[in-house]
A protein has these predicted regions:
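Glycine-rich, Lys/Arg-enriched anion-binding loops that position phosphate/diphosphate groups
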Residues: 143-234, 256-259
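N-terminal catalytic cores of NTP/NDP-binding nucleotidyl/phosphoryl-transfer enzymes
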Residues: 9-69, 73
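Residue-level signal for inorganic ion chemistry
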Residues: 27, 81, 120, 180, ...
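N-terminal Rossmann-like or analogous alpha/beta NTP/dinucleotide-binding catalytic cores
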Residues: 59-124, 128-146
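N-terminal, positively charged, Ser/Thr/Ala/Gly-biased leader segments
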Residues: 2-9
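Phosphate/ribose-recognition catalytic cores of enzymes acting on nucleotide-derived substrates
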Residues: 198-326
């Protein structure tokens, strides 16, 4: 898959079949569209092209900027899409100027001039241009003028995708990680920089990597204890990164197994929300490195214990439960 970030220097596409969307999560619902895209391109010996936007359009056209929580960062989206057999991914800078161009200009100056498409596949509810006045009917009306065909994604599929995206975010936030993974079609993951903590875990016999998630838009799971796989700066590749359509991990190398705690550590101080990962049988210094965490299963809610001894006893049990599912 070729990735294009400069829309003023795009290649000349051959019989381009394009679809347009944010594709946050690149989940099972999205793959219905992606499969249709590839099928239509194959029919005409053409190239499949996904057009997506960065930043997320809601950040530009909505006042509720703080409400934007994304399943994938841009790099993660690229990574997952790269395993799905698409020819081209075009990342369009989404600006006020782009959002406010007349709908006719969007079709003429953007879709036609940049892509010269053979076919455009869009949802029945696709809106574009100033005040979102452009719609499927306008595109259908202008298609003969510019010589492209237009195919509609049915309402039930679009609605299913919207529901899936919402359900995935809700599942991640509310600890139903197994449902999120099922809807995604792969194991949910996130990355963070390993930073210094108070090193209490070492004293308890369970050293942890404290993670700082640097992308404020990236969704992370709700508070609780989880069974996880981990990868440090790409050294251990434990997941087929979007190349598998199911939610099972593949293990070409020995995976790093572990457990993760997200929350306020009520037994210790309860003042700051932290993400801590205990990687089993691992003793390298990794401060400043990037850890990727694949969240496999929610184990239990965060609990305040009466003593550190009680906490350690529960952590012992958490490890046992983690190993059962990893």
């Amino acid at each position: 898959m070729q990735v294009h970030r400069d829309i003023d220097n795009l290649p000349t596409f051959t019989n381009a079949v394009i679809t347009i969307g944010t594709f946050d999560g690149v989940h099972v619902g999205h793959r219905q569209i992606i499969n249709k895209l590839k099928t239509e391109a194959l029919k005409i010996n053409g190239e499949s092209v996904i057009v997506t936007f960065h930043p997320h359009p809601r950040k530009v056209i909505s006042s509720a900027i703080l409400g934007v929580r994304l399943i994938n960062t841009l790099d993660e989206k690229i990574e997952v899409l790269s395993g799905l057999g698409i020819d081209h991914l075009v990342i369009v800078p989404f600006t006020d100027a782009f959002a406010n161009q007349p709908a006719e200009d969007y079709i003429r100056n953007f879709l036609f001039e940049k892509f010269h498409p053979d076919t455009i596949i869009i949802g029945y509810d696709h809106r574009f241009g100033r005040e979102r006045l452009g719609d499927y009917k306008l595109m259908e009306k202008m298609a003969p003028q510019f010589g492209f065909k237009i195919k509609e994604i049915p309402k039930h599929i679009i609605d299913e995708i919207a529901i899936s995206s919402t359900n995935i975010r809700e599942a991640i936030l509310h600890n139903d990680i197994e449902m999120a993974n099922k809807l995604l079609g792969y194991t949910f993951f996130f990355e963070g920089e390993v930073v210094h903590g108070n090193k209490l875990g070492r004293q308890l016999g369970y050293p942890t990597a404290n993670l700082k998630v640097n992308d404020p838009e990236k969704i992370v799971p709700g508070d609780g204890i989880y069974a996880v796989y981990a990868e440090v700066d790409g050294e251990w590749s434990t997941v087929n990164r979007g190349k598998s359509y199911d939610s099972q991990l593949t293990t070409p190398h020995s995976p790093l197994k572990g457990m993760m705690s997200i929350g306020f550590r009520p037994t210790v101080d309860g003042k700051k929300r932290v993400i801590e990962v205990n990687v089993f049988d691992f003793n390298k210094e990794i401060y400043g490195e990037t850890m990727r965490v694949y969240v496999k299963k929610f184990l239990r809610a965060e609990v305040k214990f009466n003593s550190l001894e009680e906490l350690v006893k529960q952590i012992d049990q958490d490890k046992i439960e983690s190993l059962k599912v990893l």
